[in-house]
Design a protein with these regions (language model features):
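Conserved helicase NTPase motor core
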Residues: 79-179, 197, 315
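Inter-lobe coupling/hinge region of RecA-like P-loop helicase motors
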Residues: 189-197, 218-267, 305
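Short cysteine-rich clusters marking metal-coordination/redox-active sites
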Residues: 404-407, 424
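A basic/glycine-biased coupling hinge at the interface between accessory DNA-binding modules
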Residues: 1-107
Length: 442
């Protein structure tokens, strides 16, 4: 039997009360279940909790970065119902957090920046610096910018900033990519020096990753060049008909990797590590001393394998990178979690290109590899980014790579006296003589 409810009951705030009354009139028996038991029982609910915690932390970080207290946060959101409801939900968390800091006589990083800016503006500190150097400038937040501006207004100095707008991936912590993309609007006439030569990875990977990230027309145009001019395709799909098969095929490829190489398994979210449980040949152990998840592959103890979220992998590199969960799911890669209206209110500058931050995050994931990137994909659930790469480079081209287990080169087809076989592309370069028969049943 259907119970009829109305939208206006939700707007009036008494939907739950009226629904309960209607259910009791139909003699529906109620069973009180503790909320925490529901969340523990259902794994998908744990992801909802993770999503809410992430949203709450982002809102708290953004509001503190903008020097907005709990009451001001509620006031700023009152024109938008959804924003107001979320602000009202987060308000007790923000107050509890602020009270905890006050009672324990502590300050967090946002407080440090705000207090430092206050001291400078009130002439409680005299700036004597002639030069200030800012590293990772693409991650600058509004509070950090205001601090730098206050220092300069107090006593002028020469400012030197190093950053890469393509790697701006910390919006949830308050970073604002416009401070680097529109640098001269914030700091006036400036000299820009471009570092466009890299020693980290091949020209092929540069070409693919650069073209991908510059699909966003707002990103700064660059023409990167590598000292490694290997032009063989550096990105490969590993695609299965379901998630379990995709992970199996990934492990099969890992078994073929050269000896003693380093491997990163990258996830958009921490819980992407759960995908590794699909194959019993993999085991994951959390290293408390380093805060990393080490992965061990049966019969390949020589491989140095680590799981990271893409955010945590920034600044690091491995020989081979496997990017997990390239699916069209809500929590796939790119994530389909949209900015909340409240978050949009707190963001000072527009970054409205579709999936702009996710695109930069995927670029960071691609460029963690020194030699080759493998994209783990499930058939008929390909993410927007995977479809884009397939349309650009062709599905067959992305899937024609086999890794030489001897030198890490590319296995290509040869026609011999006794039939077709796979041989290493580095045969002429370094005389790698590895060959493999072709399994006609595959």
């Amino acid at each position: 039997k259907l119970i009829e409810c109305y939208a206006y009951e939700d707007f009036e705030g008494n939907l739950e009360e009226k629904l309960e009354k209607k259910l009791k009139e139909q003699n529906v028996e109620f069973k009180n279940i503790p909320l925490e038991d529901i969340f523990i029982e259902k794994k998908e609910y744990q992801k909802i909790i993770h999503s809410f915690i992430s949203t709450a932390l982002t809102i708290i970080n953004l509001s503190k970065n903008n020097n907005i207290n709990a009451e001001e946060l509620l006031e700023k959101s009152k024109e938008n119902k959804n924003a107001y409801l979320l602000a009202d939900l987060i308000l007790p968390l923000r107050k509890t957090y602020d009270n905890y800091l006050y009672e324990t006589k502590q300050i967090d990083f946002a407080d440090m920046l705000i207090k430092a800016e206050y001291y400078i503006n009130d002439d409680l500190f005299k700036n004597t610096f002639k030069y200030i150097i800012v590293d990772e400038y693409q991650d600058v937040s509004s509070s950090q910018y205001r601090l730098l501006k206050a220092l300069r207004n107090n006593n002028d100095f020469k400012l030197f900033c190093v950053g890469d707008d393509w790697q701006s991936i910390y919006q949830f912590n308050g970073s604002d990519v416009s401070y680097i993309m529109d640098f001269q609007e914030f700091w006036g006439p400036s000299e820009i020096s471009r570092i466009e030569t890299t020693y980290r990875f091949s020209q092929s990977l540069i070409d693919i990753s650069s073209e991908f990230v510059m699909k966003n027309p707002k990103q700064i145009r660059k023409s990167l060049q590598s000292k490694n001019m290997d032009n063989s395709l550096a990105v490969t799909e590993i695609k299965g008909f379901n998630t379990k098969l995709s992970i199996k095929f990934m492990v099969d490829r890992m078994l073929e990797l050269p000896k003693n190489c380093s491997v990163y398994l990258l996830g958009r979210y921490t819980f992407d590590a759960d995908l590794l449980n699909y194959d019993s040949r993999l085991s994951v152990k959390y290293n408390t001393s380093t805060g990393t998840q080490k992965v061990y592959l049966e019969n390949r103890k020589d491989l140095d394998i680590t799981f990271y979220t893409v955010h945590k992998s920034k600044g690091l590199q491995a020989d081979y990178v496997f990017i997990l969960n390239n699916s069209s799911d809500f929590l796939g890669f790119p994530s389909k979690v949209e900015n909340t209206p409240l978050k949009n209110i707190l963001l000072e500058h527009d970054d409205s290109y579709e999936n702009s931050e996710e695109r930069r995050l995927f670029y960071v994931a691609l460029t963690r590899a020194k030699k080759h990137v493998f994209l783990i994909v499930t058939k008929n659930r390909e993410s927007d980014f995977i479809q884009e790469l397939e349309n650009t480079y062709g599905y067959s081209q992305l899937n024609d790579f086999y890794c030489c287990p001897k030198c890490g080169g590319k296995l290509i087809m040869f026609h011999g006296e006794y039939g077709d076989f796979l041989g290493c592309s580095n045969y002429n370069l370094n005389q790698c003589k590895y060959t493999r028969k072709i399994n006609k049943k595959a």
